């Protein structure tokens, strides 16, 4: 994968742009480039103050939060966000009037270390500029949470001299959500897809709050079609749904019948698995994919290379040497664009 632009967009943002350009359905939105954080951090000498602090990591985290809380979003960034929000509001076909604001660290989703889940995601954010700016700042602050700092130290990255972009997307009110691996991370098999799903929003799945349904799907090969080889029900006791018009999510208890219902129909399983094979071919490597369905429409909300697989020799790897789209100076998620400031 072409990595030079990852420092501009963060791993998550870069992958979402690549997915969009590959023709995969990604929720509309825009990206606040990492340089916006860099400018804000420089304006208040944030990194220097963190490195000069002689206290514990907890002391450094408290200092960083205090400095960032007192540093407003710049007028130029606020104006750019307001402009693109107005573009979003003009689209009558959006699935939701709310936004998901997601951290996109510059060391996130790299081939050698994923950093997945280290930084914050803010859900159900209203589309006014004040709410979005507050959510962007919350993502910036999460870069310096204790867990994130320690993870960077343990993986050989600078704990304080780092950066972050922020992805702002339309919030899809997911009826069911899932995580899919296009290879078996335990056995290394490239011939199977591992799929886990839940009813409602995917945050219940990725945080491990509920039992998941599981499918193992054999990939097509030659004349052999794609086929489900294992289905295991997880019995989900509750689901998370949007708390609209208020921020946040609500826990909804499921009836006995609902709890025992599989999160995806057979048709949805085939749809997402076929799409996942296309994403894997597009990237040229096995992928970890997050997705959801709304009104039976599939949305890809994230994709990243699987970092824990052993290497396959090039001559045995049919995914080797795939081409990728040329980068342009615009950050585009569907029809909504924000210039790279």
Predicted segments, located by residue:
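Conserved divalent-metal-coordinating catalytic cores
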Residues: 1-22, 28, 34-35, 134, ...
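N-terminal beta-alpha lobe that positions the nucleotide/phosphoryl donor
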Residues: 1-167, 176, 259-267, 272-284, ...
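Conserved functional hotspots at enzyme active or ligand-binding sites that engage polyanionic ligands
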Residues: 171
């Amino acid at each position: 994968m072409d990595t030079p632009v990852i420092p501009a967009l963060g791993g998550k943002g870069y992958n979402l742009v690549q997915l969009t350009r590959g023709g995969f359905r990604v929720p509309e939105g825009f990206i606040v480039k990492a340089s916006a954080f860099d400018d804000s951090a420089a304006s208040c000498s944030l990194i220097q103050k963190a490195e000069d602090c002689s206290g514990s990591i907890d002391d450094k985290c408290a200092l960083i939060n205090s400095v960032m809380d007192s540093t407003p979003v710049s007028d130029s960034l606020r104006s750019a966000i307001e402009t693109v929000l107005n573009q979003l509001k003009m689209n009558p076909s959006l699935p939701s009037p709310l936004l998901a604001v997601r951290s996109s660290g510059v060391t996130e989703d790299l081939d050698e270390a994923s950093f997945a889940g280290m930084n914050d995601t803010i859900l159900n954010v209203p589309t006014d500029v004040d709410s979005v700016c507050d959510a962007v700042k919350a993502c910036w602050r999460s870069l310096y949470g204790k867990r994130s700092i320690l993870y960077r130290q343990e993986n050989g990255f600078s704990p304080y001299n780092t950066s972050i972009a922020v992805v702002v997307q339309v919030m899809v009110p997911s009826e069911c959500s899932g995580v899919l691996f296009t290879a078996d991370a335990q056995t290394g098999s490239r011939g199977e897809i591992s799929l886990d799903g839940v009813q409602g929003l995917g945050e219940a799945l990725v945080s491990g709050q509920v039992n998941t349904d599981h499918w193992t799907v054999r990939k097509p090969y030659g004349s052999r079609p794609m086929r489900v080889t294992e289905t295991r029900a997880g019995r989900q006791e509750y689901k998370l749904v949007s708390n609209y018009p208020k921020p946040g999510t609500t826990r909804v208890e499921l009836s006995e019948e609902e709890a025992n219902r599989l999160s995806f129909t057979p048709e949805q399983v085939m749809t997402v698995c076929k799409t996942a094979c296309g994403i894997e071919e597009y990237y040229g490597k096995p992928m970890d994919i997050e997705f959801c369905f709304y009104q039976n429409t599939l949305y890809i909300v994230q994709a990243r290379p699987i970092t824990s697989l052993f290497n396959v020799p090039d001559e045995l790897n049919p995914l080797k040497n795939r081409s990728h789209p040329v980068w342009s100076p615009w950050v585009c998620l569907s029809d909504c664009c924000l210039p790279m400031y």
